[in-house]
From Swiss-Prot:
Residues 50-118 are annotated as: Disordered. Residues 114-173 bind DNA. This is Putative homeobox-leucine zipper protein HOX26. It comes from Oryza sativa subsp. japonica. The keyword Kinase does not apply. Probable transcription factor. Its main location: nucleus.
């Protein structure tokens, strides 16, 4: 009796456990839960080969970033140099009022690229350009087209040549004015020094006591004025002698 009751109880427990497992399987998704693999302590740490590979990847990424930074810096420097060259090349006169800075309507990138190159002229072309510049230093659009046809050049090249020629003329005029002002400044400085010396001599002569009554009666004359009087006297004597020779 007791053995049969135990068998019945165990069978009922197995049925209950089976039903519970079935319900859990249906609730989860008709599949039993997966067990996570157990990793040992040695398997958790990366191997030396993986460490070397990871270090190589990091070093390669760092080198790539450095190379990109150097390339960007070089590109920035190149752009700055090009912009400075364009600014120096495009600098011209500020008083151009005939639209010389504008490109001709029939031109294009080819003419602009050709105008940036150094223009080599023959003797006849240079002479004709100089004559045209002396006649009119600023040309209209029609005059530029006509002169370009005579020279066998583009209108843009003629325009750039006239701009550079005007800039050189203005620079030479400025240098000449500076030279003239420098000479005048030196001349005035010399006159100032001479007048200071004369003033010092006059002060010394006026402060010294008179030696005799004749010295008191003698007027005090500036040395430079006395020199001018002597020069005028010599000039008058030479003019009188020349007049006498002409009358004879």
């Amino acid at each position: 009796m007791s053995s049969s009751s135990l068998t019945t109880t165990s069978s009922m427990d197995s049925v209950v456990d089976g039903g519970l497992d079935t319900r859990l399987s249906l609730a989860v998704g008709c599949c039993p839960p997966r067990r996570r693999p157990v990793l040992l302590f040695g398997e958790v740490l990366p191997s030396p080969e993986k460490k070397v590979a990871a270090a190589a990847v990091v070093a390669a990424g760092k080198r790539g970033r450095e190379q990109r930074g150097e390339a960007e810096a070089e590109a920035t420097t190149t752009r700055q140099r090009r912009s400075c060259k364009k600014g120096r090349r495009g600098r011209g006169d500020d008083d151009d009022d005939d639209g010389d800075r504008r490109s001709p309507s029939g031109g294009g990138g080819d003419e602009e690229g050709a105008s940036r190159k150094k223009l080599r002229l023959t003797g006849e072309q240079a002479t004709l350009l100089e004559d045209s510049f002396r006649a009119h230093n600023i040309l209209s659009h029609a005059e530029k087209q006509e002169l370009a046809g005579k020279l066998g050049l583009s209108a843009r090249q003629v325009e750039v040549w006239f701009q550079n020629r005007r800039a050189r003329t203005k620079l030479k005029q400025t240098e000449a004015d500076c030279d003239l002002l420098r000479r005048w400044c030196d001349h005035l400085a010399a006159d100032n020094a001479r007048l200071r010396r004369d003033l010092a001599e006059l002060r010394r002569s006026s402060s010294s006591p008179p030696v005799s009554g004749l010295a008191v009666a003698t007027p005090v004359v500036c040395p430079s004025c006395a020199h001018d009087d002597k020069r005028r006297l010599a000039f008058a004597t030479a003019a009188a002698a020349a007049g006498d020779m002409a009358s004879n």
